[in-house]
Amino acid sequence: YAAGRWYAASAEGHPLLDAATGEEVARISSAGLDLGAMAHHARTVGGPAIRELTFHERALLLKELATHLTGLKDEFYELSLSTGATRRDSMIDIDGGFGTLFSYAGKGRRELPNARFIVDGATEVMGKTGTFVGQHIMTPLQGVAVHINAFNFPVWGMLEKLAPTLLAGVPAIVKPATVTSYLTEAVFRAMIESRIFPEGAIQLICGSAGDLLDHLDCQCAVAFTGSADTGRHLKSNKTIIENSVRFNQEADSLNFSMLGPDAAPGSDEFDLFVKEVAKEMTSKTGQKCTAIRRTLVPGNMVEDVMKDWSRRRGGCARRRRWRRPHPSA
């Protein structure tokens, strides 16, 4: 969705396959898309329109959008199956995303003024006579926010970035990860069709982002979620460096859980440890950025921990073995 219209690439595109059945779900390509025009549209159309609103007005739009999307979530759940997600996985992604919109809507009305700017701190007197004073204020950036998202949360990943961006009064261009972009596109399409936010406030690129970063300036920002290598590559872009473009990177993390030597088998702490690690190994097939990827267990407890893990994981395997291609749990 670029510069106020839906765009279909002239190229054949790359097929996106159902993770369970291997059937083609969609094709993806951004070939021929004028990325400079998208950035210009955000600056000249989306930015002025959303900056006209106060923080409270933007917050109310976030709430309206969250309510609207929640009413459509069953169709998003159905499409989410093709990404390889179970219903529980989808709840984290879809309901979690909508919940984020609700959360920022509430924070915007509770914590921010019903104004277009924020007064930052007290007035500072900078002259002996008191006639020379200064006051800091915070206003929206005049550029565009570019959101480059990861594959594991096609809905929540988009909405967790959009919520604070739109609340701040900045237009955004969303670039979802390729393999699950069809789910992002479905939710985004519902957002556009709702006409809740003004035109130009949000745009979408499915496929390569091409030279988009080359069209950014010092009033723009990039929020990236993905691998550290890709993040370093993007951050070293000549335009990003020369124009001092704000760049926020959420990359590889290694979370661990440690079992204390006093948490004996049968204790509440032992059961909690095993339960949480097993949950993190299976939720989103262990691909959450916050997943526990390493455990530290006292040597004399390893056998007990492995036995309990095997029991929990074995139960999951037996339940899933007889499911249809699309799991529902």
Please give the residue ranges for each predicted region.
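ALDH superfamily catalytic-core signature
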Residues: 190-195, 219-221, 229-329
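Short Gly/Pro-enriched turn/cap motifs at secondary-structure boundaries
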Residues: 5, 135-137, 285-286
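Conserved small-residue-rich beta-alpha loop and adjacent elements
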Residues: 113-198
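Beta-loop-alpha module in the N-terminal Rossmann-like domain of NAD(P)-dependent dehydrogenases
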Residues: 145, 152, 206-213, 226-233
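N-terminal Rossmann-like NAD(P)+-binding subdomain of aldehyde/semialdehyde dehydrogenases
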Residues: 1-129
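A structured beta-alpha segment of the ubiquitous adenosine-cofactor-binding alpha/beta core
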Residues: 134-135, 202-223
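Hydrophobic residues in well-ordered beta-strands that form the structural core
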Residues: 174-175, 206, 249-251
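Residue-level signal for inorganic ion chemistry
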Residues: 22, 58, 169, 202, ...
